Amino acid sequence: MAPRASALSRFPLAKSIAKCFPGHLKRRTNRKPEIVSEELCDHALQRLSPYLLRNRPLDILDLWPGAGLWSSKINRLLQPRRHVLVEPELQNFRPLLDPLAQSHPSYKLLSMDVFSIGDWKPVLTEHFPEQGPDNGDHTGVLPKNDTLLVLANLPATTSDKDHFTAGRWWQMFMETCMQQTGLHSYGAIRLLASLPSPESQAIIPRYVVDRRRVSLWTENVALHTFEVAAPQDEKFWVNHKGFNVAIDNAARVAERAAEKNISTPPGREFQPLLPAPESPDPGRKPVPYTPRIRTALHDRFCEDIQALDNMDKSTPGYAEAKKKRSRAQTRLNRDNRQAYFLQQMVDQSREIDAQYDALSRAAADPNTTSADFKPILDKISALRSSITDEGQENYHDHLKQFPHIHDSYRTSLRSNNNFDDALLAWDRRPFEPLLIHPEELYPQGIDRSIVYFEPNPNSPVIEKINSLDPSQRGDAFRLFETLSLSLGRGRESLSVAEVLQLIFPGRSTNDIVKSIPSLAEYAAKTPKPDFDSFPKTIHGGSTDPVTSFQENLDYDLSDVRVHILSTSTIWDICIEYQRSGVSVSSVQLNRLFGGTLTSYKTGVHREMVKKRLH
């Protein structure tokens, strides 16, 4: 394939941006590459128009507009009443933004440090006089305001010591959305952001182990969160998610797009997921071929294996090529063998989950006796033994992937093997993101993605929080903050049982599940020794025994990791903690979970914000 032209040679706007940053200032543009391709803007807005063309009149708050191409395209599509451009580096972008601001009376051009704004209410009052309490739609539990749209072209940090990343700004946006403060003072608003791709993948994680703080806060209030456009990535995350899950999920996304008649413009398609090659010689211990993501290492194996096919035995280097082929086949076979046993362990773990579901339903059957559980319990025991045996066939690095892939299956396909009810927004995406080519951003070489967020007026999390008196929500919020912080790097294996022991000392798991029935669906279950003496009733909001508390069962959450819990269940834990009357400060809670707090979380960013817990 011929190399694509550079941004400077293809797009006049790239040259104009370069002129805005002469000499030593050019390095500063690396913080925030600008969209220079009109076609990318047009394709992205074609995708977004059903979400953006909602109602008029509409106001737009446009943060870090930079070169202004994206801003001008959105203005033309939405025809806003007011479009306020806030560019912190206006001294550099003025040659591009001044003509834009003068091109239509809806524009107003300002310069201020966006990150330092602690209270947005005065900004709304001064520059958006039509915004007020009457703009809010209060028909849902979370009031929404479709008359204000925020565009944010978030910069990257300039230093590893800078804690205030684009993701942190996004997280604050979600927190204030929950609290109905700041930009959400008159109702929850929509956000269309461009930001560094790693930050986008933190907001919309591809696999459950990457589900951390910013994604949890987003899930609390999101109706829609999806990538509109993104650069090509190497898809290493597929190794953690599971190749089969990723393939099946992509197929379901294609079905969703077809159902909505959504097509992808030519050249905007992502490369499909390719499986690793099969070995031409399966070796002395053959196992069935197991699909996994193809990598550059597999390509090298193929080259070494195929190189010998074109060589005569008398050719110099034949002996060395033969050794390379043998090594490549051995490594390819070993890679397949590890993948095979890993998949076997995952499949058996999924079967154990299914057996626990069957056990729950049997325990609710009036005709079941304790003797009826023996086949189920025997099968669970046999499956566990098999997992232990197959675990011995795997290297340590592969074994570490086992709980990750099992959890990915649990969160993607737990509900009736249906991706539409999956935990992660990535699994529920309405379409694949459009492909951003490197030269469509200037400067090149820094990946950025475009993400759309829309709040959910019927958020189940907000409904749960509303069950508490406003004066009694502080401890619940503090625990949620601490739990979300604890899911940082190194704490992927944090179990629900560990958390419950820390915040509910002295309480049994059964007692806690009785108070929080939503935990039941995740737990391992066994019939109580005196099962026959207990009633078969189920407790909780569900009629399905799997998701309800049953007095005749014992529950175990020691093998359940926190990152697979829905935010709704996490908030059930937080609300039970609030009601328990045990009040601990954020710092004390954080110490319980072995974490550390940055100045960001100790409240520096909130000094000017009066927090309203909805």
Predicted regions and their residues:
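Short amphipathic alpha-helical patches
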Residues: 223-230, 507, 523-524, 597-601
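Catalytic cores of RNA-modifying enzymes
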Residues: 2-466
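A positional/structural detector of protein chain ends, strongest at the extreme C-terminus
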Residues: 612-614
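S-adenosyl-L-methionine
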Residues: 1-81, 474-478, 489-497, 509, ...
